[in-house]
Amino acid sequence: MKNKKLLTMVLAAAMVVGSITVPAPMATVKADTVTTSRTNILREDGVVVSQQHGSARSLIDGDITTVWDTNGWNGSQAGFPGSGKHNYSVWAEFTLADYYNVSDFNVWFKDETTQKNTAWQYKIEASIDNSNWDLVVDQTENTVTDKHFENIVGKDYKNKIYKYVKVSIVGAKTDMKPWPAMTEFAAYGERATAL
């Protein structure tokens, strides 16, 4: 009987310990740099943008004080002022360091007076061939005004292999007149073992 109680207690403890999940470390903003224990899988020399005013390399330099922004406010006014909705069509496309199963992304938007209280609307797509794109993160109806977003890839795409990633700013919900601008973009995942 004593052994049965001991076995029951050991099994119960094992079940509790086995059910505890520890969240993976996510990139966080600290001061003027991006701090993470994970490696951004975007290649430094593999970024192409639709247009730029600030350097496209600013998106992956780990410094949130550097900015990639567009050539000014070019959105559809959609009834501005007062409508609160602007449409954009700007993007940044990245080549991954290798073929990856991409798991998640971090996006940092510019934080200044004209961007305050702006809910940036964006989408993230991924491709293996740079021609056929999967919509892996859809924030095109976003109404949250944060400047940093952690995005988990949709379950239908977690096991797919990708070589290219594109983030597109498609809109903004605000009464301001902001230029589309991002300070940092990061992708995380596991290197694919086979194609």
Q: Which residues fall in each region the model found?
A:
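Bacterial Sec-dependent N-terminal signal peptides
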Residues: 1-10
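Hydrophobic helical h-region of N-terminal Sec-dependent signal peptides
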Residues: 11-16
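Sec-dependent signal peptide cleavage junction
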Residues: 17-34
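Feature responds to low-complexity, polar/acidic, surface-exposed segments characteristic
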Residues: 24-27, 37-39, 47, 142
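Aromatic, loop-rich ligand-recognition surfaces of beta-strand-rich domains
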Residues: 32-33, 66-133, 151-195
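Predominantly extracellular/luminal regions of secreted and cell-surface proteins
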Residues: 32-70
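Solvent-exposed serine/threonine-rich low-complexity stretches and specific carbohydrate-binding patches
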Residues: 135-144
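Short glycine-/Asp-/Thr-/Trp-enriched loop segments that recur within the blades
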Residues: 145-149
